Amino acid sequence: ILSSPNALQDFHTKALEDYGITAFWPEAVLKEAKVKKENIAREKDILETFPFVTIDGEDAKDFDDAIFCKFSDTGFHLKVAIADVSFYVKEGSALDLEAAKRTTSVYMPKKVVPMLPEKLSNELCSLQPNKRRRCLCIEIDFDKDGHIKSYKFHRGIIKSVARLTYTEVENQLINGVEDSKYAGSLKAAIALFNKLIINKGYRGALDFTISEPFLQTTADGDIKHIDDRKRLNSHKLIEEFMLAANISAADFISQYAKEGVYRNHEYPESLKIQRLSQILKNRGINWNGSIEDIENISAFILKLNKREDAPILNMLILQSMQRAEYSTLNKGHFGLKFDKYTHFTSPIRLSLIHISEPT
């Protein structure tokens, strides 16, 4: 199928058919999505005074999150603004039921089948630059070593000052932050990120070196070749900030919410660990899969990354882990090394997040 003249279009058609994904919307959903342009000009919000930015891929249109960071007397202050989808998608509405049915946006090469109609996903809910957008904001205070000291949630309105790409931010990470409205925020964000990465290592969180393939296509949609997408430090910066927001949300749910959804990742199963140990032994690698070995597996992965076959070994170890699952019961997250964890930072493209959202 990938060798045909219309390979990409054929792939899209077959993938949608095979997985029962529809690109069409029921009339009731489209009707609800035609939200009258609301007048929020009179609503003033202190959040608008902060130079929030979004950092996403070059092709992104649904901007779920925006960040602002600054140095504080005690360390760092981070604000993470998350698109307030629940303002437009009411519980039990046609939009809500359709999102629950789809569960997630589907991303394919050069095509996205959104969970919500584009009027919402790419416009009203998307934290576009220079446009006032409703959000759920979490403000997190860190000490000088990057440990969370306190947090608070509140709804508000932001006006992002820039739509940045991972490549643009990576260049500034390497060459220095450029003069801009957000320069001070980005400098503080980089400093906080460096602390969080150190803490991640101390925590023993898993960090696999696995490339992500993506298709390079012509303007007509013909496939030229398949490349490996490199994971940049700018990706990791946003990942770490979203992790901080998500563990704060999980803590909030555990303390104050009557119910909520956690993202659990349980301890590896013994049979899979035994198989992994044997495979590694066949490759001349001594790893017994003891409790001590498993607890220190992140350090083991770092050693393996010096080998030529590191990508293969990373994949083998990943396949030996249990799959992360959602549950109303908290069981902790083995891979991230968190006592509790949830997802609430991608509401435009993941329906379950609406249940986990702190309110």
Segments and roles (model prediction):
Residues 1-82, 86-135, 163, 168-170:
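Charge-lined substrate channels and their catalytic hotspots, especially those that engage the 3′ end
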Residues 133, 357-359:
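Short, small-residue-biased leader/transition segments that mark boundaries at the very start
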